[in-house]
């Protein structure tokens, strides 16, 4: 029987040496928001606690400035 091994999750921000997460980088922020508009938890993305806090504030700022939607399009 073949076993399936999950890839180890790692923080991409720590690996890339990011100091501060920018709220204007919409393409990067969209990777951490679901289709319905929710912020993806760190246990799924593997983001460290420090960068998860920065990520959530960056997403909330982008939403406030209408760069990101709060919810999906409700079709």
UniProtKB/Swiss-Prot annotation:
GO terms for biological process: translation. Keywords: Ribonucleoprotein, Ribosomal protein, RNA-binding, rRNA-binding. The keyword rRNA-binding applies. Transmembrane segments: none annotated. Signal peptide: none annotated. InterPro entries: Ribosomal_bS18, Ribosomal_bS18_CS, Ribosomal_bS18_sf. Pfam families: Ribosomal_S18 (PF01084). It comes from the Bacteria. GO terms for cellular component: cytosolic small ribosomal subunit. PROSITE patterns: RIBOSOMAL_S18. One of its GO terms (molecular function) is small ribosomal subunit rRNA binding. Part of the 30S ribosomal subunit. Forms a tight heterodimer with protein bS6. Binds as a heterodimer with protein bS6 to the central domain of the 16S rRNA, where it helps stabilize the platform of the 30S subunit. Belongs to the bacterial ribosomal protein bS18 family. This is Small ribosomal subunit protein bS18.
């Amino acid at each position: 029987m073949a076993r399936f091994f999950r890839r180890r999750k790692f923080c991409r921000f720590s690996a890339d040496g990011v100091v501060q997460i920018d709220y204007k980088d919409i393409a990067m922020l969209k990777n951490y928001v679901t289709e319905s508009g929710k912020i993806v938890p760190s246990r799924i993305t593997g983001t460290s606690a420090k960068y998860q806090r920065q990520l959530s504030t960056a997403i909330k700022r982008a939403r406030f400035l209408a760069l990101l939607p709060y919810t999906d399009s409700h079709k």
